[in-house]
């Protein structure tokens, strides 16, 4: 049965793909694959038959998912933002992925707020981020907007490498992300000016990276993906380019950040015990500790102890402690062990024994932790995990392959992806019972219908409440959305026939329809979780804001560039006037004095007018040129000014 279902789904998929191609034929250009991570993001492209992971402007292949706003009003994204976290913690935003698609009341949001250095406020039952964007201006951003800024950075990284505009992308999400989180991620893409052609699950993308070139018959692959903020386990069968997800499980709130947090809390307590001082009051000190703890954690993957040294940590005092691997493991042992539960669950759901697993693929930076590797190995009775792929880049690699498929690249071969919905979907029926329509681990895309009726006589309206989760009662599950079907003709209870249809698309996003079979009256809802989801108007406003930000960034850069040009020119002249071997030795004392005075004047003006606008900087440079050039022309006759002044200075970027 299962095989024929798969074959049918395959035919359906290939059929729809072809039909879509016939319909579309639009040129989507180069489609990029983006791994939008909690702590780091990565972008890849399928080019000339292979995947290229693209380095950012700092030369790094992964980019911190950080956005910062400086007091001068500059917006920094990526490495530059992360590097100034300790000096500007209140306005440096990270971990947006832990807030995206969640409600304000979500216990995990409430837990996170305690440890985030920036302000998180409630707006329309959602967590919004409040920062000072410079010039004493406060602004609130939805988590989608912060994620959009990171996506924009990845888009620009790809554009710089490709030398052309990028408009279409495949973006990855944790397999265990629910409907609201997937929709919100798609919205973030829209705000960043990207058409997100497909949302794919991270472990599935990693499996593509692992199995793209494996052609030796059917294999069972277990992907264990533990990143900075989320954890997924997926079990797939790979068979000559067909990747079928059999089961998936995980925790969308478990990762390296939680391990860091445990260590930080340990040291904060220790410091209080030793000095009586509570560091938590000082945001900067806590962020300095965060930075050093993360460094120490990485070091402990290859050594048994690491020193944590922080100069002027708190109230001028230094911090110096040792963290051993054993202590790190002890502080996190319950979290490490909890990663085995989803592994067990996935095996149960797919009716497989441990010995049936052919390969274990470790993905995500946190799988470098020796204890995690040891626990996985012990769970699988000593079986060594596969070491063939880069845990940081595998997800973006797989996304880039899928992007290649969607852009019609012939070199990707016959790649077919069959993914599943991670959670059971259903509706509430009398007594608050969860009536399941689509069980978890059903292959998507899928469509299921069921007939329901009214609960009381002459009931004119039925309210359809859509839930996801595994518990028998809806109160224990997650409400996705609600809608009404009205205009039901008066009839005794149980007589009207109401057909409810659930349809999940390839992105794992759900659409629900209800139809009164008697009247043909229909109502539908794309589950966009109205309280949770941005409205089209909000998205449009955010798109405009994002464009405005890009414009402001450009203006700011232009202002800095013109300021630097004036500064370089002035200092270049100052150095030449002072050099007796060069210009200084050739000028008459009168001309020298005129030039020195003009140069000093401009340097002083610069020091007191850091915030002047572009026109002012240009005007001051012109004034200086008008004084200097006649003197230099006189000196050199008609040979023109010496080449080492303005032209050379203007060509050099100041550091």
UniProtKB/Swiss-Prot annotation:
Where do we see the Glycyl lysine isopeptide (Lys-Gly) (interchain with G-Cter in SUMO1) cross-link in this protein? 354
- Give the matching SUPFAM superfamilies: Actin-like ATPase domain, Heat shock protein 70kD (HSP70), C-terminal subdomain, Heat shock protein 70kD (HSP70), peptide-binding domain
Q: Where does ATP bind?
A: 37-40, 97, 228-230, 294-301, 365-368
Sequence positions bearing N6,N6,N6-trimethyllysine: 586
Q: Which InterPro entries match?
A: ATPase_NBD (IPR043129), BIP_NBD (IPR042050), Heat_shock_70_CS (IPR018181), HSP70_C_sf (IPR029048), HSP70_peptide-bd_sf (IPR029047), Hsp_70_fam (IPR013126)
Where do the segments described as Substrate-binding (SBD) lie?
A: 421-501
Segments carrying motif Prevents secretion from ER: 652-655
Q: Which domain of life is it from?
A: Eukaryota
Q: Where is this region: Nucleotide-binding (NBD)?
A: 126-281
- Single GO MF descriptor: ATP hydrolysis activity
Q: What class of enzyme is it?
A: hydrolase
Q: Which residues carry this modification: 3'-nitrotyrosine?
A: 161
Stretches for region Disordered? 635-655
NCBIfam families per the record? PRK00290.1
Name assigned to this protein:
Endoplasmic reticulum chaperone BiP
The upper taxonomy is: Eukaryota, Metazoa, Chordata, Craniata, Vertebrata
């Amino acid at each position: 049965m299962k095989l024929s279902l798969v074959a049918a789904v395959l035919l359906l998929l290939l059929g729809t793909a072809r039909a879509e191609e016939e319909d579309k034929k639009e040129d989507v250009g180069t489609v990029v694959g983006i791994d939008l991570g909690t702590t780091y993001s990565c972008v890849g492209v399928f080019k000339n038959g292979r995947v290229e992971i693209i380095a950012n402007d700092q030369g790094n292949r992964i980019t911190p998912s950080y956005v910062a706003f400086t007091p001068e009003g500059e917006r920094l994204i990526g490495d530059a933002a992360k590097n100034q976290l300790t000096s500007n913690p209140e306005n440096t935003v990270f971990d947006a992925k832990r807030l995206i698609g969640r409600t304000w009341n979500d216990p995990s949001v409430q837990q996170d707020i305690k440890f985030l250095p920036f302000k998180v406020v409630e707006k329309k039952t959602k967590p919004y981020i409040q920062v000072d964007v410079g010039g004493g201006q406060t602004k609130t951003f939805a988590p989608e907007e912060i994620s959009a800024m990171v996506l924009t950075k990845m888009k620009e990284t790809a554009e710089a490498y490709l030398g052309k505009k990028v408009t279409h992308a495949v973006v990855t999400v944790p397999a265990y992300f629910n409907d609201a989180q997937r929709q919100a991620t798609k919205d973030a893409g829209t705000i960043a000016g990207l058409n997100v052609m497909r949302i794919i699950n991270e472990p599935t993308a990693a499996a593509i990276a692992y199995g793209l070139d494996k052609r030796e018959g059917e294999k069972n692959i277990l992907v264990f993906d533990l990143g900075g903020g989320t954890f997924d386990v997926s079990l797939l069968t790979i068979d000559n380019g067909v990747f079928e997800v059999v089961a998936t499980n995980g925790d969308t709130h478990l990762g390296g950040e939680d391990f860091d947090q445990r260590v930080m809390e340990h040291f904060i307590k220790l410091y209080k015990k030793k000095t009586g001082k509570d560091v938590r009051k000082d945001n900067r000190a806590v962020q300095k500790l965060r930075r050093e703890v993360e460094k120490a954690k990485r070091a402990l993957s290859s050594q048994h102890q690491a020193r944590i040294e922080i100069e002027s940590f708190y109230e001028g005092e230094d911090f110096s402690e040792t963290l051993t691997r054993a202590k790190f493991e002890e502080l996190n042992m319950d979290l490490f062990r909890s990663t085995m539960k989803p592994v067990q669950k996935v095996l149960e759901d797919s009716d497989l024994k441990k010995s049936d697993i052919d390969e274990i693929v470790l993905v995500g930076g946190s799988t470098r932790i020796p204890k995690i590797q040891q626990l996985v190995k012990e769970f699988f009775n000593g079986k060594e995990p596969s070491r063939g792929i880069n845990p940081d880049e595998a997800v973006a690699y797989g996304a880039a392959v899928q992007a290649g498929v969607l852009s019609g690249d012939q070199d990707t071969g016959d790649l077919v992806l069959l993914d599943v919905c991670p959670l059971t979907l259903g509706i509430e029926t009398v007594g608050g019972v969860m009536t399941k329509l689509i069980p978890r681990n059903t292959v998507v895309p899928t469509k299921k219908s069921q007939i329901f009726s009214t609960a009381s006589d002459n009931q004119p309206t039925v309210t359809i409440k859509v839930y996801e989760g595994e518990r028998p009662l809806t109160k224990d599950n997650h409400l996705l959305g609600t809608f009404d079907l009205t205009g039901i003709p008066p009839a005794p209870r149980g007589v009207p026939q109401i057909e409810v249809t659930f349809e999940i698309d390839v992105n794992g996003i759900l659409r629900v329809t209800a139809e009164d079979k008697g009247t043909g009256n229909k109502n539908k809802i794309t589950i966009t979780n109205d309280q949770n989801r941005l409205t089209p108007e909000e998205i449009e406003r955010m798109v405009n804001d994002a464009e405005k930000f890009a414009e402001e960034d450009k203006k700011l850069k232009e202002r800095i560039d013109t300021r630097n040009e004036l500064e370089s020119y002035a200092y270049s002249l100052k150095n030449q006037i002072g050099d007796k071997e060069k210009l200084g030795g050739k000028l008459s004392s009168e001309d020298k004095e005129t030039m020195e005075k003009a140069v000093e004047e401009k340097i002083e003006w610069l020091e007191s007018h850091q915030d002047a606008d572009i026109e002012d900087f240009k005007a001051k440079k012109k004034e200086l040129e008008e004084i200097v050039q006649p003197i230099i022309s006189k000196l050199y006759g008609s040979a023109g000014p010496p080449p080492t002044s303005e032209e050379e200075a203007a060509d050099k970027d100041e550091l």
